[in-house]
C-alpha cells in the first residue's frame, strides 16, 4: 500500500498541524508512500483516483457519503477520521489516527462492501447515475401539501398512499433519515433495501424491507408542484417526470474497518444511547 489519498472537508476544524501529523504517521509506516490531498472531494472522481490504494476521509459522515459516491466506480476502499458531529461511518477519532494508520499498513483491517443505490428517471438521459450510499428520497416541493404515491416492486403493485415523501434506504442508510421516519435499524452486511414513507396519512402504511435485488418503482399520482429527489441528503434535483426507479447499484462502497471496532458498540454509543459506554450492563 503506497498510494494514499486524503479527502478533507474544509468546513471542519482541520489545521495544517493535523495534516502534517498525518503525513508524518504515514511516512513512519511507509517512507515511499505517495500522498494525494483532495479538498471537498474535488477531483476525487477523476480516473487518476483508480490508482489509489486507500482514501482517508477527514470530516464527518457526510464527507464519507460524498467520498463513497465519487470513488464507487474505482473500487477504492475508504475510512474516516471523524471531525464531524456523529461519526457513525467516520468512526476513527483524531486521537486514534496514528494507531489506525499503523494498522492500515500492517494489513490489520477488514473491508466491508456496502450496498449502494442507483436511481433512473423515466425519460431522462442516464448520463447522471444518481448513486447513493445512504438513501434516495422523493418528497413534495416547497408547498405544505402531501403527495399521492404508488409503489411497485418488481413490476407488481405494492401500495398507494398519500404522504410527505418516500425514502428508499440501504442497510447503511437505515440509521439515517429512515430511522427518523420509523424504519428499523438494519445490520450493514444484509442484502436488503428498505422503503420508509415520510408522514403517511394512514396508520397502516409502515416501512418494509425487501430483497436487495428488488426494483422499486415510485409513481407520483397527484402533485401540486414538481417533487424533489434528494441523494444522501446532499444532492438535490427537481423531478419533472412522474416516475422514478430505484434499485441496487452494481457499485459498492468499500469501507475499511479496523479490528478493534465493534458495530454494536458504535450503535449503542452513537445511535441508541449517545451516552457513556457501560460494558456488559
Curated annotation (Swiss-Prot):
Subcellular location: Cytoplasm
Organism superkingdom: Bacteria
Active site: 61 (proton acceptor)
Coiled-coil stretches noted in the UniProt entry, renumbered to this chain: none
Similarity comment text for this entry: Belongs to the NAD kinase family.
Biological function: Involved in the regulation of the intracellular balance of NAD and NADP, and is a key enzyme in the biosynthesis of NADP. Catalyzes specifically the phosphorylation on 2'-hydroxyl of the adenosine moiety of NAD to yield NADP.
The protein, known as: NAD kinase
Species the sequence originates in: Clostridium botulinum (strain Kyoto / Type A2)
